[in-house]
Amino acid sequence: MIEQLLRRGADPNLAKKHYDLTPLHFNCAMSSEKYLAGVVLKIMNEDSHQIMSINMRDRYGRTPLEWVVARLSPNTVNVLLDHGADLSNFVFPKERRFDYGVKSNGGINIKITSGILAVVESLETRGYELSRSDALTIMNLFAKHKLFVKRADLEEPNWQDHEEVTSFAKEMMISPSLSLYDLLHLQPDEVTKRITFKEFFEFARSKKKLSTLRKKGFEACVVAHLCEKLSRRFFQSWTLYPFWDLIHKRLPLEGCDMILKNAMNEDLYHTFVTAGERSS
């Protein structure tokens, strides 16, 4: 419908009366699908007499890019950045803003975890530098929606003892050069060298790929391994210097890094928060 209106000459910068949102704002606020934002931008490219202010802020001060980041839509983030969204004035959304995009049942959720990591990856690839406040917002999302993995989640049932599941994991490709089986056996510090978070996000969106694991009762364990492993580097890198400060720099950074490698993400989160409280 929006595409038809734009083709008929509707002003793409005109805000909807009841929402104070332009069509682009409305798309980005109400959908997480890449093609919806892409439709608007495609029409603007075809009809050069119409000018779209892609960096326009709505009455709440939000740009379309800030909307789709809060909706955990990395595909749409990339579409907007490809078409001129300005990162120099980008404001990372506050924690409550993510409520629009995070629909959680209060447990480990591979879609939310991969969405958070993929959005951050998209922003950083284009030059955005996360602040400590941004990192804390992301960690708080993990805590708020109970995305942290417990050690018990990683232990039972043991999928590696199940021949059919192991065979499936070897055949299931996460990327052109990496199988699910190989990914599950990588160390956390090796993961980001072999797979992008965008690839992880696309895998998480596929309802069919985890169906075999679900039927055999191994989905929860495998998902726990993936979520903990792929988000580990984010938590570890942000906790390294705060932990160093907490111990008053009594160990070299290399030693601190070795210690943190053995911690769970939830432990790293609490360390990060504690360090922030003591420094304030």
Language-model features and meaning:
Residues 1-280:
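Ankyrin repeat (ANK) tandem arrays and their immediately adjacent linkers/low-complexity segments
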